[in-house]
Amino acid sequence: MTIHHDSLPEIGPDTKQTWRRTREDHSAGGVAYRRLAESGVLELALIATHGGQRWQLPKGSCEAGETSVETAIREVEEEVGLLTVNEQFLKSIDYWYWDTYRKEVPELVHKVVDFYLLRMIGGELCDDSYEVDAVGWFTPEQALKMLTFGGEQSVVQMASDVLSDK
């Protein structure tokens, strides 16, 4: 049986209860930041995926035996080349999506992502990861306009609020 991806049902309560192929995914990511020494300007690292069309925070799936914060720090280093330290947990977001990558029958995925505020301590911003099309430093205001997903916008807003108090 092949399901055409353009005919997938909208995800709603009924879909979540009746779709047979579902899975849970736990990921973690970070709001990696730096403050420019001369001007004091705050900048956040974002990545672009899907041909540069989707701007988002660096994140990825937790590996076996890894804590959520360890995942966030590892993913930021892998995806944007930065060494960071955790300053604090920000929040978790969750959402549902259709995983159609290399699948004859799509899976309905419930994803939970833990986000941390990560201060840059080394490394250099780069887009060497095969998963990333572009990277960049952006002010919180710029990042809020560029981010594709509302959940990540709420994370950046929270990080901006925390950092404005420092």
Model-flagged regions — what are they?
Residues E75-V80, F89-W96, M158-K166:
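A general structural signal for short secondary-structure boundary/capping elements
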Residues T22, E107-L108, C126-D128:
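Short secondary-structure boundary/capping segments
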Residues T2, H50-R54, V113, R119-K166:
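Nudix hydrolase/Nudix homology domain
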Residues S39-V85:
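Conserved Nudix-box catalytic region and its N-terminal flanking loop in Nudix hydrolases
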Residues G81-G123:
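Active-site segment of metal-dependent pyrophosphate-handling enzymes
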Residues T2-E38, V105:
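Acidic, metal-coordinating catalytic segment for phosphate/diphosphate chemistry
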Residues L36-S39, G51-R54, E63, D94-W98, ...:
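Short, charged/polar surface micro-motifs in flexible loops or helix N-caps
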